[in-house]
Amino acid sequence: PILLTQTEKYINSGRTNQLISYFHNLALYHTGKLPYQLFDYPQKLGVKALYFPWNSDSRESEYGHFIYEDLGYINEAQRWEFEAMVVWGETAPHLLNLARYNIVNKRPEVARRFINLLKQSLFYRGDAEELEKQLHAGSVPGLRMALENNKEHPARFANVINIGPELQYLCEQDTTNRMAFEYLMSDLLLSNNIVRFVDNLKFIRHFKYPEMPPAYQEALYIYKLGVDGETFSKSGFNVSENTEKRFQRYYSLYKNRQMQRLKAEFGNTYWYYLNFISPYGDKIIRN
C-alpha cells in the first residue's frame, strides 16, 4: 500500500506530524496491522495520532471525515465535511461526500442539492449521475452506516474533543465493528488507560484473531501486576507464558539501566511506550 509506505518513510526520518500519524494509523488498520504495529513507531503524540479533536483548524477540517466514514459514523463524517466545505468552498470532493452521506442518512432532497451542483461541473457530471441513481435506495456502494439499526437512540451529540466515548458507543451498539474496537483499544492504550482497556477487551471475542496481539498481552500483564488474583480472574483472560518471560527480560534490562539494549529489544512494545514515550507520563490511569 502506497500510503503506508509513504507515511512509514516520513516517520522513520524521525519527524513527528499529526496528519502523517493520522493517515499512517488508518493505513495500518486497513492492512490489518494496527493491533500488531501500533508501537513499531514512536507514538509521541499519544491519542492525537489517531484522530483530530475538533478545534476549528482549517487544514484538519479537510481530512477529519476519513476516520468517521471508515467507522461508519456517518453523522460525524458529514459534520466534518460540511465544515470543510464552509472553509474551502463548494469543491467537488466535498460535494460528492455530502451527497453520499445524505443519501445513506435518508435525506434524498438534501443530497439532490449537492448532486445538482456537481452536475454543473465538467469532470464530475458522471459521478453525480451515478449518485442520482442511488438517491432513493438509501445506500451507496462502499459506505456503511454503523448505527443504522439503532432505533432507540437515533440522535446523539458526538464528543468532538475526545473520540474515545464515541468508539465505546460504536462498540456497544455494533459488536461486529472491528475498526471501532481496534481504535478503542488503541485510544485506551495510548492514553495509559489500562483499566478501561481491560474492561473493554471483552469485545475481542467477536473477532477472529489468531491470538491476542502482543501489545494487548503486554497491557494485560501490566494490569495483572497491579491487581490481586481474584480481580484479575474476573477479566476472563490469561497472559501467555511467553509474555511473562519477555517482561522479566524487559524488567531486568530496565533495572540494570541497559537502555540501548532495552530499546533495541523492546522499543516496539507497550511497556516501552508507557515508560519512555507516552506524552501523559509513565503513570497508569486507573479510572
Summary of predicted features, one role per range:
Residues 193-241:
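Intrinsically disordered, low-complexity segments enriched in Gly and acidic/Ser/Thr residues
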Residues 7, 114, 118, 131-132, ...:
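Generic structural signal of hydrophobic/aromatic residues within well-ordered alpha-helices
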Residues 1-164, 168-193:
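Soluble catalytic regions of membrane-associated enzymes that act on cell-envelope
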Residues 166-170, 190, 230-287:
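Terminal, low-structured helical/coil segments at or just beyond the last alpha-helical repeat
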Residues 176, 216, 268-270:
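Generic structural motif recognizing short loop/turn segments at the entrances and edges of beta-strands
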